[in-house]
Every structure is written in C-alpha cells, then in structure tokens.
C-alpha cells in the first residue's frame, strides 16, 4: 500500500513497486540455471507551469555507493550497500537509490516543454556492458530484496547539457503482463516545481521470459493525489526521443 504526506511544498510518498524485464542477446549464457537479471525504470515528470523553462537535459550524472555501519556493542554490522544516481537536467535534480537491485548501466533523458522523461536501466548482454549471470535462487532473492527510492527536487543549474554521442542502450525487456511486487521504498517530490509524476519499474530476466522471475509496479502522483494504479510503461514515454546521459 502506498502512502504520502504533504509537508509544505514537499510530498513524501512511501511506495511499493514491482517490475518485470526480459531480453535476448547472442551473448546470453547457455548455462543451465543461470540468469541475466536487469531493471528498467521509466519516469515522466510534468513540471509546474510557473517553472522557468529549462530544456538542458543531462547536465550532470553522479554515482555514489554508500554502506551503513551500525555499531552494536563492540561489533560493527555492515548494512547492504546502496548506490545512488543523481541526474541534474531540465530544471530538476533527481536522485535514485538502489539496494540489492540489478546494476544500472544506462541513463537517458528527454525534455519537451514542461515534460521531462528519464530512464535508468540495465543493459542486456552483447552491448558492451557487464551483465553477469546469477543462479535462479539468487535471481529470486534479488526480486524479493531489491529496494528503490526516488527524490526529485528543483534545480537551478545553468551548465550546458552533456549528452553522449552513442545510442541509448537498454535492457530489451518484454513489457508483458506480470505480477506486482513492492520495490519502491520511498519517493520524495518537491511540488514547487513538480506538478505530476508517473513512473514504472520492472525487474526480471533479460534473456528469457520467465513469469517467476519478472515483476513490475507503477505509481502516479497527479494534481496532488497519489494513485496505486500502475502506469502502462510501454506508452509512458517516447523512448525514441531519449538522449544518452552516460
């Protein structure tokens, strides 16, 4: 169940999101009981009408991995590392956190007026990115434990876009109907600049269809109201307009 709290100009959303993915590649492993797991996150943000026009996408991308250390008596218990990706562009500062999830290898953006589209995804085997195969048991554990957070704030960054010249790479997932599962831990949205937010997340095997290894979820925040209805991620954004940020 998703919950949200509006505080001043901030909307805090505790969301749950599942995701499903699948893809094929000549470099997929042929080993039995091995799977190339991936994640695909699609975000559509509609900015407030009064937000100053800024179409400079991909101004900067940073990646930071943090591990929480909890001291218990004389022992130090290390928590699972969380990797944060911060994307600045088009008047927004978007921070995504991933814990025990498939690796993000592709980040892209597009902007059209007050609409900003962003995509973060794994990259399927055979496209020059590392995509290690894991066992079925490890894949099921990843689906169960993967947790994601989103924090979208306003940005006044004025630097030029840093768009890469290579094509946007992706996970080549199936986007078929699959079961839902909680993946999103929390979402923070600064309503000073964000009017609406829609996003979809999928996790699954990138090389073969397997309903047991694919999950998805979606979330909407529209005109001040949060909705648990998952967005149809196949039509959420026009992927052909995305430009590579990394």
Swiss-Prot record:
Record-level GO cellular component terms: extracellular region
Swiss-Prot/TrEMBL induction comment: Expressed in the early phase of the viral replicative cycle.
Biased composition (Polar residues): 108-125
Location (main, coarse): secreted
Coiled-coil spans in chain: none
Bridged cysteine pairs (disulfide): none
Localization of this protein: Secreted
Protein name per the record: Chemokine-binding protein
Organism: Monkeypox virus
Designated gene of the protein: OPG001
């Amino acid at each position: 169940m998703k919950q949200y709290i509006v505080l001043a100009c901030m909307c805090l959303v505790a969301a749950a999101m599942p995701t499903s993915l699948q893809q094929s590649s000549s470099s997929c492993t042929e080993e039995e009981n091995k799977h190339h797991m991936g994640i695909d996150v699609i975000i559509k943000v509609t900015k407030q009408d009064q937000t100053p026009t800024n179409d400079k996408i991909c101004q900067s991308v940073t990646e930071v991995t943090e591990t929480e250390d909890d001291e218990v008596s004389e022992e130090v218990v290390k928590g699972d590392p969380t990797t944060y990706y911060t994307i600045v562009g088009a008047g927004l500062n978007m921070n995504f956190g991933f814990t025990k999830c498939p690796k993000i290898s592709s980040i892209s953006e597009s902007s059209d007026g007050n609409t900003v589209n962003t995509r973060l995804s794994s990259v399927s085997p055979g496209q020059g990115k590392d995509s290690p195969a894991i066992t079925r048991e490890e894949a099921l554990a990843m689906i169960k434990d993967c947790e994601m957070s989103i924090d979208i704030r306003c940005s006044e960054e004025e630097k030029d876009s840093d768009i890469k010249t290579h094509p946007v790479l992706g996970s080549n997932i199936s986007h078929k109907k699959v079961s839902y599962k909680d993946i999103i831990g929390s979402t923070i949205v600064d309503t000073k600049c964000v009017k609406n937010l829609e996003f979809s997340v999928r996790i699954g095997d990138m090389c073969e269809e397997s309903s047991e290894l694919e999950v998805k979820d979606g979330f909407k925040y529209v005109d001040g109201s949060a909705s648990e209805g998952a967005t149809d991620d196949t039509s959420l954004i026009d992927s052909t307009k995305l430009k590579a940020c990394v």
